[in-house]
Amino acid sequence: MKKVVILAGSPHLNGTTAALVEHMLYGAQAVGHKVERFNVATMKVGSCKACMACHKPGGDGKCVQRDDMDKIGPAVVAADVVIFATPLYYFDMTSQLKTVIDRFFSYGESMKKPKEVYLLLACGGPDAKSFAPVTGVFEGICAYLGWTIKGKVLASGCMTPGDLEKTPHCMTAYEMGQKI
């Protein structure tokens, strides 16, 4: 059994990205994995202030901000698997998800333990090439942290959950969850 953390970046809790998350979550739970889901777009997470308090010699190594990152960060550090889920916003992830990732900085080396990563990405546009910029960002983040991207669902042309249901993406997400 693996510890799986889902960081869902969409503010639409019943939207396309949420549907992908649900399918992958059910797949992972079906084979016995422990899954913790954070809907980061509805949580209170302040942006990094670049104050460097988390890296000051003699300090406690923690971010000075007290917010929902106090729950998210330790869960990610302890996870074996991290699933990033986001709709495409101007060829990138949502700002809410990016804010959480920026705050990984305060966890220093403890965040750099090997993990498996899966991407669940959705966009309304029909061209799958639209995902290239954001997948590049995730590849860079994972390379820096020493994490390995094991799978991706790139759901283009899926503006609504109804659009998504007409594609194989939900089944792909479910099966990917089972293969963790």
Feature locations, PLM:
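N-terminal beta1-alpha1-beta2 submodule of the flavodoxin-like/Rossmannoid cofactor-binding fold
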Residues: 1-85, 91-107, 162, 167-180
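Short active-site-adjacent structural elements
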Residues: 128-129, 160-162
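A charged, well-structured terminal subsegment
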Residues: 138-156, 164, 174-175, 179-180
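Short, glycine-/small-residue-rich phosphate/pyrophosphate-handling segment
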Residues: 95-96, 106-152
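Short beta-strands and strand-loop turn motifs
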Residues: 7-8, 85, 119-123, 153-155
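Glycine-rich beta-alpha junction loops
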Residues: 44, 124, 156-159
